[in-house]
Amino acid sequence: MLSGEKVSLRPFEENDIENTVKWLNDIEHGVLIDRVLPTTIHERKEWFYNISKDKTASSFAIVLTENTSHIGNCGLINIDCRSRRGQIWIYLHDQYIGQGLGKEAITLILKYAFHYLNLNRIYLYVVSTNLSAITFYERCGFKNEGTFRQHVFLKNKYEDAIWFGILKEDFDLLEKI
């Protein structure tokens, strides 16, 4: 388990699937992520079994440190040990957004990526209309690295994707502040 002051990250478990399906099927927020909605428990179980065998991915449940309540999920995908990079993802249940918990979870997973996996670069993309996510990742130290035009199809139209990245050296400087 990776522990912080307010949140901890533990390996994603099968009993986390039911909460995950509810969160992913929330139309209000689900349209901001690049996936087909709705999803089913069966589909999420299949995802869980596949990702648990995938050597290029790590998935975590985000839990409150004080009582271990499951409040979200995060992870790394497309881990490339040769080039020492990976793609990060995160989502929190609505009631926990805006409390600094997501930032703490991102910090924990970046520590894991840079200090345990010895990766050098972590990246992600955000739909250009998701302004709160853009602000969030910038506050976490990610840098805007460019735009892929019409990269994602959402709500019956194409949206641009903004790519963000953070290097180990940048993260190490942020930790000293």
Spans of features found by a protein language model:
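Conserved acetyl-CoA-binding loop-helix of GNAT-fold acetyltransferases
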Residues: 92, 98-112, 134-139
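Conserved catalytic-core motifs of GNAT/GCN5-like acyltransferases
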Residues: 12, 123-126, 143-159
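Short glycine/proline-centered loop/turn elements that form peptide/ligand docking sites
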Residues: 102, 106, 129-133, 150-155
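Terminal substrate-recognition subdomain of acyl/acetyltransferases
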Residues: 157-177
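Acetyl-CoA-dependent GNAT
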Residues: 39-97, 167-171
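Conserved active-site tyrosine of GNAT-family acetyltransferases
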Residues: 137, 142, 164
